[in-house]
Structures are given as structure tokens and as C-alpha cells.
Regions:
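Juxtamembrane and boundary regions of transmembrane helices in multi-pass small-molecule transporters
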Residues: 3, 136-152, 166-167, 171, ...
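Interfacial loop-to-helix junctions that mark the boundaries of transmembrane helices
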Residues: 11-17, 38-48, 80, 113-122, ...
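Hydrophobic core segments of alpha-helical transmembrane domains in multi-pass membrane transport
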Residues: 22-35, 49-59, 91-98, 128-139, ...
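Transmembrane helix-loop junctions in multi-pass membrane proteins
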Residues: 30-44, 64-72, 98-113, 132-144, ...
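Helix-loop-helix junctions within the multi-pass membrane cores of secondary transporters/permeases
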Residues: 76-78, 85-156, 334-415
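Transmembrane helical segments that form the transport core of multi-pass membrane transport proteins
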Residues: 241-354
Length: 519
């Protein structure tokens, strides 16, 4: 029975992975065989990378369900039950710090800013996440509305953004998405659910989300402050070198070189969380042996999934994305990159590993009121729109602030009109949508296009992650607005039906028995 259930779950996750990745493969293949021919070696590397990505997603989503989510929920619940604010603050800061410092994408971000020592940047960003994870948890425990905190923090961010060097803006805003990776997001979200589960008040459900939203603010503030302190002359960028292979053996060597690197990187990434959990298990949790075995198996699945996923996207997808961007932008009608970017953006967010975790948790926590399908559609529309705007930036060189400032103004304005839970989900969605697929396909695509057009890659191409993180804040809240209007219409209809029934009953009461007999 257990084996059959396991096979069923694995098959279900495989179907989800195929459904998420096949549209991207289809779009790339259509482009390759029509307006954007790419070398066979790059195409074959992309196809092999896609296979690894599908298998990796399958294992990751199953592993996150079995391990990362229950780990986060149990730690959150246990910390809340301690009733000791000092313990909660210290442990949440340590947790936020260690899961950020081990994020592989943070190392890449540090390399983009040579004016600041790598470890200075990494420690500053990790400290930012640690502080804001503490702030997010305290917000939940004391019932402080998320919108109030966001309305204070984002104006501060934009005031700082107006005085830092232009080259620094895109890297700073990208950092918010970079530090909320596929491994940390499910854990942090589950931590929030664990904290809110202990509360029994009516606002507990609304406060289940919002941790990722505030954790994304920390890195942006940290990088902007470092930009002011170090007065950097600009961030660094080296043109992407696309490795071409002459045969299948050379192509296989590319993956052989990439695989050990990601085996090591993901071990470093997962180890701090695993150690934290096992120490917590020994000292406080004392979970049953059967539960621990399931969690350990889930951790192994998560590890295998992330290794395969990251190898596939970095070795296979990154070169293809860069090359496609160069070829399409080099056409006599480069404007076509805007609708193509939107089409890719619409489908690629479905392949983000943490998106499935978010949509399923939202559907479960709202008892189906907010369906996974509606969430997925809203995210896809948001990312499509963001990619269109990002490609406009590549073509025109417009400053990212002209997009981010009105975008966040609209997002913050909507917080006054939509249900609170939608605001929290929306601001969490920004960090979830801007995952590894954005960093390894959309960003190289944007960089390739910028290189072909002769633009400034640092100011015009970087910032894609920030754009992808911004638009779901608007689309998810619009979904909330639609949901609210529908609920109000249902209530009005129910009230109308109740009034009609009441009138009928009163009329019947006025009919005497003789009239009833005659009838």
C-alpha cells in the first residue's frame, strides 16, 4: 500500500513537472526552427538540461512536501509555544542568517559588485534577512498588519534608491529575489504557517503569509546601504561566454563538470537548515521515529531534486537563453523581443519549483477559496507583463526606477482595498516568482539581447529579477479585489433570497386554514 502511494505521488509530481516545463521547451524549439536559429550544440545542451530540470522538479516538489514544509511548521509551532520572545528573536535571527548565507545565488550576486568585498556583502545581506525574519515573526505574534510595515519600509527603500549610484540600483533590487531561493522559500513559508497555527484569533489565517515578503526587503536595504557606505564606482559584468561542443562526448563533459559543483553547493545550502532542525529535534521537538524517517527521506529527495534542477538550468538553459536573446535582438525588427519575452514569462513561472509549494499552501490554508489554478494564472500574467516591461528597458535604456516606483505605488495602494490575506500572499509571491528560472534563463536572455543592441548590461539588463518580483504584487491583489467583489455579490444575492423566502413565509402565515383547505 505504501509503495503504491509513493508511486502515485511520484507520478503526480512528474505530470506537474512535465506540464510546467514542456511549454518552455516548445517555445524555445519553435523559435530555434523559425526566427532564431541557434547552434546544434547549444540546442542539444538545452534539451538535456530540460530533462534534468523535469526530473529535478519532480523530486524537489515531493521532497518539499515530505520534509521542508513539516520541518518549518513544527519549528514555528514549537517556538510559539515557548512563550519566550527572547528565544524566538535569537533563534529566528540565526535561522534567517544561516539559510541566507548558504544560498548559492548570493555568491553570484556578490561577484557582480567587485567594489565591495564578497564576504562583506554576503554577511550584510544575511544579517538583513535575519533581522527582517525576526520582524516578520514578531509582526505575526503581535498581530501587526503587514500593509502598515510595507507602507513604511518601501518609501525608505525608494528614498535610498534615489541617492545611490545608478549602476547599483538593479543589483540592489535583484538581491531581494535572489536571496529567496527554492530551498529557503518553502521552509520560511511553512515556518509562518507553524507560528500562526498556534493562534486561535480570527486574524491568524491572514498572518500565515508575509514572511517571505519582509525577508525580501532586508537584502534590498542592505545592498543600498552598502552602496552608500562604500561609494562604489559601479558593479561588474563580464560578457557571457557560450561554450560550444562539437560532439555528444564534449556535451556530456559539460554536465559532468557542472554536476559535482551543484552537488557540493546544495550540500552547503541544505546543511545549515538540516543541522538546525536536528539540534531542535534533540533539544525540543522529540518527533516520533516514523515522522523523522519520512522527513529524512524528504530531505534526500529535496537534495537530489535541487542538484538535478540547478545543473539542468545552469548548464543547459543559461547558454540557450543568452544566445536566443542575442539572435532575436539582432533581427531587423528587434521590437519582437517584447511579445516573445512576455510569452516566455507567462509559461516560465510555472517551472519555478517554489511556485507549486506556494499555490498548494494557499489553496489548503484558504480551504479552496483561492484555488491553485487562479493563483498560477495571476502569477503567469504578472511575470508576462514584467518581462514585457524588462524588454522595453533593454530596447530603450529607461531607468528601472521609472517602472519600480509606480509599480510599488500601485501595489501599496491596493493594500487599502483588498482583503489582508491577499496582500500577504501577493508580497510573498514576488519572492517566489523570482526564482532560479528567472536567474538562469530570463536574466541571460535579457543580457544577450542587451549585448546585441550595444546597451549597458548592468543598468539595462540586470533588474529582470526585480521586475519579476514586482508585478505579482499587483496581479495577486487584483485577484483579491475580484474575489472580494464576487463574495459581496454572493452575500447580496443570499440576502435577497432570504428576504424573498421570508416574504413567502409571512404570506403563508396570513392565509387562514379555510383558504388552505379550499386550495
Amino acid at each position: 500500500m505504501g509503495l503504491q502511494l509513493y508511486q502515485k505521488n511520484l507520478l503526480e509530481k512528474l505530470k506537474e513537472s512535465l506540464g510546467a516545463v514542456l511549454p518552455i521547451i516548445g517555445i524555445v524549439l519553435v523559435l530555434c526552427f523559425s526566427i532564431a536559429p541557434i547552434p546544434n550544440s547549444v540546442l542539444m545542451t538545452f534539451v538535456v538540461g530540460a530533462v534534468l530540470l523535469i526530473i529535478g522538479m519532480m523530486f524537489f516538489t515531493l521532497g518539499a512536501e515530505m520534509a521542508m514544509t513539516p520541518m518549518g511548521e513544527r519549528i514555528g509551532t514549537k517556538l510559539t509555544n515557548t512563550r519566550k520572545i527572547s528565544v524566538v528573536i535569537v533563534l529566528c535571527f540565526i535561522l534567517g542568517f544561516i539559510i541566507t548565507i548558504s544560498e548559492p545565488d548570493l555568491q553570484v550576486l556578490a561577484e557582480q559588485v567587485p567594489s565591495i568585498p564578497n564576504y562583506t556583502l554576503i554577511i550584510a545581506v544575511a544579517t538583513g534577512v535575519g533581522i527582517f525574519l525576526v520582524a516578520a515573526v514578531l509582526r505575526m505574534l503581535f498581530g501587526i498588519p503587514l500593509a502598515h510595515m510595507l507602507l513604511i519600509l518601501y518609501p525608505i527603500i525608494f528614498i535610498l534608491a534615489s541617492i545611490v549610484p545608478q549602476d547599483f540600483l538593479t543589483v540592489a533590487f535583484d538581491s531581494g529575489g535572489v536571496t529567496t531561493g527554492p530551498m529557503t522559500v518553502p521552509f520560511i513559508m511553512a515556518l509562518g504557517i507553524g507560528f500562526s497555527a498556534v493562534r486561535s484569533d480570527k486574524h491568524a489565517e491572514n498572518d500565515s503569509f508575509g514572511l517571505v515578503a519582509l525577508c525580501s526587503v532586508g537584502p534590498i536595504l542592505a545592498v543600498l546601504l552598502l552602496g552608500l557606505l562604500y561609494h562604489p564606482g559601479g558593479s561588474g559584468y563580464e560578457q557571457t561566454m557560450i561554450v560550444k561542443t562539437d560532439n555528444s562526448v564534449e556535451m556530456w563533459q559539460l554536465f559532468q563538470e557542472g554536476l559535482p559543483y551543484y552537488i557540493k553547493e546544495m550540500l552547503i545550502s541544505l546543511l545549515p537548515i538540516i543541522l538546525f532542525f536536528f539540534i531542535f529535534q534533540i533539544v525540543s521537538l522529540h518527533l516520533h521515529k516514523k515522522t523523522m524517517v519520512k522527513i529524512i527521506i524528504g530531505i534526500i529527495y529535496t537534495y537530489i531534486g535541487l542538484v538535478l534542477f540547478l545543473t539542468g538550468v545552469n548548464v543547459g538553459f543559461m547558454p540557450a537563453g543568452n544566445y536566443l536573446g542575442q539572435v532575436i535582438a539582432g533581427l531587423s525588427y528587434p521590437w519582437i523581443i517584447v511579445p516573445i519575452g512576455m510569452l516566455i514569462g507567462y509559461f516560465i513561472v510555472k517551472a519555478e519549483p517554489a511556485v507549486y509549494v506556494l499555490t498548494e499552501q494557499v489553496e489548503e490554508l484558504t480551504s479552496g477559496a483561492i484555488s491553485a489554478k487562479a493563483m498560477g494564472m495571476s502569477l503567469s500574467i504578472g511575470v508576462a507583463f514584467s518581462l514585457g516591461l524588462a524588454m522595453v528597458r533593454v530596447l530603450t535604456g529607461i531607468s528601472i526606477l521609472w517602472f519600480l516606483l509606480p509599480g510599488y505605488a500601485v501595489a501599496l495602494g491596493l493594500t487599502f482595498f483588498v482583503p489582508k490575506i491577499f496582500t500577504a500572499i501577493a508580497f510573498d509571491s514576488g519572492g517566489v516568482a523570482s526564482g532560479p528560472m528567472t536567474a538562469t534563463f530570463l536574466l541571460p536572455f535579457s543580457m544577450g539581447a542587451c549585448e546585441a543592441l550595444g546597451g549597458n548590461v548592468v543598468t539595462d539588463a540586470f533588474g529582470v529579477v526585480a521586475m519579476v518580483a514586482m508585478t505579482p504584487l499587483i496581479t495577486i491583489q487584483i485577484l483579491g479585489l475580484i474575489y472580494q467583489i464576487q463574495e459581496q455579490m454572493k452575500e447580496k444575492q443570499a440576502a435577497k433570497d432570504y428576504t424573498s423566502i421570508k416574504v413567502c413565509i409571512e404570506n403563508l402565515d396570513n392565509v387562514d386554514n379555510q383558504e388552505i383547505i379550499e386550495l
